[in-house]
Amino acid sequence: EGCKPCECDKSGSRLEQCNLYDGQCDCVDGRGGRDCSQCPEMSWGDPFLGCKSCTCNPDGARSLYCNKVTGQCECPRGVTGLNCDRCDRGTYGALPQCIPCGECFDNWDKLIAQLRDEAAAQLRIGTEIKLSGPPGAFAKEFEELEQVLMDMKSHVNSANVSSDQLENIDQELDNLSSKLKDLKPNLASHGSRTGEASVKISELYSRVLNLQSEFNKSSAKTKELRENALEIQEQDVSGAYASIQESLVKSSALQAKLTDAENSKNISVYFRTSVEHFLQNSNFSDANSENGNENSLDKVVEFMKAVDENVSSINTELCGGTGSPCHEDCGGAMCGKCGGELCGDGAVTKAVEAKNTSRKAEELIKSKYRSTSSTLSELENSNKQCKQATAEAKNNAHEA
């Protein structure tokens, strides 16, 4: 690149000659910079009027050096202020931990920026209309336009954001409304330039209506999301309640069946006791009573058959299998098991199924309750963070 002149400041350098490699001039006390025309390191301002020390916050600034002209310290993202001594708009917390407010604030911030841009655009168009002169045929449209602007201002004021954030928009809307009112006395005297004014008025009217439509869509969408969330929660809980009711009906029916089975069991015990008593009191060793014993034995056999049939019926009712011989899956009396997954007709199996169904329904209710509580807690925390971010943004705006 070749050689470059030193250009050392005569009032701030000791010599006109600079360093041959980096071009740094030899500065006198109280001067700094490459050519000695600025304040020294760690200070800023006009050296002829007096330099000021940099006061960068060590917790918030990237370094202790500041801009030599403005004194602005170099702040990381999320930190602001001349000295980088406070959290920026859209964040909360304490230095150096400035935490972003999150999606809630970001969405509102984008909406506010859009509104600010739209208001500025309407202001420019209104000024152009005033210069070009709108025709008298559009007096009615101007009245409707003023009404739309008033409605827009009402929407903005009712939004859940700080007044400082919307102050510029309100002011611009007021200015635009005032300018439109100033145009009214001149409507009759400006009948020319109809084509140009028609296009501009139509464009202005359309943009303001679109702006109002965006507010309405945003409000409707929020309401729809809240209603949908509530409806889903109610449907889930009602479904779980219906499941419990169904399980209760099944349990009641099975309880009655088990009661009948228990009665049958008591009867079989009575039969067994009677047989044992009968055998103990019978004498089969007497040869003279051979015919009588034979008749008695026949009665015992018939009696035992009846008992066996009764026991098989009880096994089927309780376990789902006859039990004689022992059923491979369902078991039975004296078989070591009773009921199972493949024994759907048994009272024991049905009772277990009903109990499991009730337990699952209970767990479902608890799960939905925990989910609902968690969702409500998140919504409350999000709303709290939005309000906190709005308050901090308002305070930051006042401090700035």
UniProtKB/Swiss-Prot annotation:
Q: Which GO terms describe its cellular component?
A: extracellular region
Superkingdom is: Eukaryota
Detail the disulphide connectivity of this chain as listed in its UniProt entry.
6-18, 8-25, 27-36, 39-51, 54-66, 56-73, 75-84, 87-98
The entry annotates sugar attachment on: 160, 175, 216, 266, 283, 310, 356
Q: Which residues form the Laminin EGF-like domain?
A: 1-5, 6-53, 54-100
* Pfam family for this entry, one: EGF_laminin
Where expressed (tissue)? Individual glial and muscle cells.
Q: Which keywords accompany this UniProt record? A: Coiled coil, Disulfide bond, Extracellular matrix, Glycoprotein, Laminin EGF-like domain, Repeat, Secreted
**Coiled coil region boundaries:** 140-235, 353-400
Q: Where are the residues of the annotated region Domain II and I?
A: 101-400
Q: Where is the composition biased (Low complexity)?
A: 371-383
Subunit structure, per the record?
Laminin is a complex glycoprotein, consisting of three different polypeptide chains (alpha, beta, gamma), which are bound to each other by disulfide bonds into a cross-shaped molecule comprising one long and three short arms with globules at each end.
> What does the domain comment read?
The alpha-helical domains I and II are thought to interact with other laminin chains to form a coiled coil structure.
Annotated function: Binding to cells via a high affinity receptor, laminin is thought to mediate the attachment, migration and organization of cells into tissues during embryonic development by interacting with other extracellular matrix components.
Q: Know the name of this protein?
A: Laminin subunit B
